[in-house]
Amino acid sequence: MRKTSIMFDRDFAIGATDPRLFGAFVEHLGRCVYGGIYEPGHPSADAKGFRRDVLDLVKELRPTIIRYPGGNFVSGYNWEDGVGPKDKRPKRLDLAWFSTEPNTFGTNEFMDWCKTANVEAMMAVNLGTRGGDAARNLVEYCNHAGGTYWSDLRKSHGWPQPHNVKFWCLGNEMDGPWQMEHKTATEYGRIAAEAAKMMKWVDPTLTLAACGSTARNMPTYGRWDDEVLEHTFELIDFVSLHTYLNNYAGDTAAFLASPDVLDYFIDEVVAIADAVAARRRAHKRLMLTLDEWNVWYRTRRKRADRVKEGWPIAPAILEEIYTMEDALAFGGACICLLNHADRVKAACLAQLVNVIAPIMTETGGPAWRQTIFWPFAQMSRLGRGSVLKAKVISDTYRASYYDPRGSEDHHFPVEAAYLKTAVVADVAGGVSLFLLNRDLQQEMRVTVDARNFGRLSVKEATQLHHVDLKAINDKEVPMRVKPERLDHVEVGADGLAMTLLPASWNVIRLEP
């Protein structure tokens, strides 16, 4: 049995979690919208076509903010196509996903869905094929009370009150050559700055995020971020980054270590942003939004493969089926987000339904939870509060990692601790522990020294574990992988101790 220990003190904190840290993402991609959150005629659909069974699972998942409408999709999207009478909305070819977009679900329908789901809206604007003019018009349409062309148009469409969207993304992944009208850092920095300026002139209360590097392996990584922030620093509040964990190599130990790379990624982007601030001698600090993150690799395909399939509406693409192994790596990313709560103030799990998602549906049929549903739901429910600095003593292992996509993906940790953990305290005196045992063979004995908390008792203790790391949840067995009770958590005057199963995700809630 492997032995580890954790020590933390309630007076030593990393930072408070922002509610927007627990966000998700809805893109016009595959069956995320059509057949996902929106399916008129489904037995569970309400009068607006929203699937109630999906809404029930979304409310259980507890996301706080939803990014929309993309993603790659937004770089070619004319937002005006998705408002007004549905029978007058045009169908368009979507060059991002080689699909046909019917536009029967658009901005106003999304705002209604957000209200029904009790989540905040995060809107992205098209800075690919369009620019600042379309962006400021959309802000006026969404947020202005009335008496102008765009605000009165919203009223004529049946939404008399402004939507008051506060968080806006200035484009999507504009450093990527796969993006419609991909730009250099200077080109994007200029258009983002001008769009931001006009958007804030329409509504000075906006929070804006600029596109940082899409991934840590981008050839322009670092230089892109520095140049973009030189143009936008004074006008924005956040810089975005994206990450998708993968196991192309088929190496489970390395896969479970890969969330540590996200730790490095965040630290590096923070350093770049702070260097831009330092050159200005500015007290302002930019925050980070990890507005796309997940496990994704099996359903990645080249664009040429999708072109051959024609231009269907809502094709079943990117429908990653998640395993127990994926849930463990995903849990490691959850821990990473919590441990960077001082600077990562927003994040969006990509995506919400069907498309690389925690929730799956069958058209006309049921909805169910994927394996990754559980770590996110537990993080969102129990991860709100002050993240504490935890001293972890754990054996480490070396992860030999290979990504067949190329050597640029070899930015990997030399050593990874078998135990990855985050500790979150709340104002009521309770504390939640998130514990990932990355040892694939051995149980782990964990002792916890919780200082300045007084006597604590176990309110809740669960483990997510399956003997088959390839186990999945599906329509036939939707609860094959689910949290089970973690027994024998021993509480004493000086702390607590427990034994974790190999390859397991564990959550313990303690209260006075």
What do the predicted segments below correspond to?
Residues M1-W224, L229-F238, L262-D263, D267-V307, ...:
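Non-catalytic accessory regions flanking glycosidase/transglycosidase catalytic cores in CAZymes
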Residues H242-A257:
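Active-site His/acidic residue clusters
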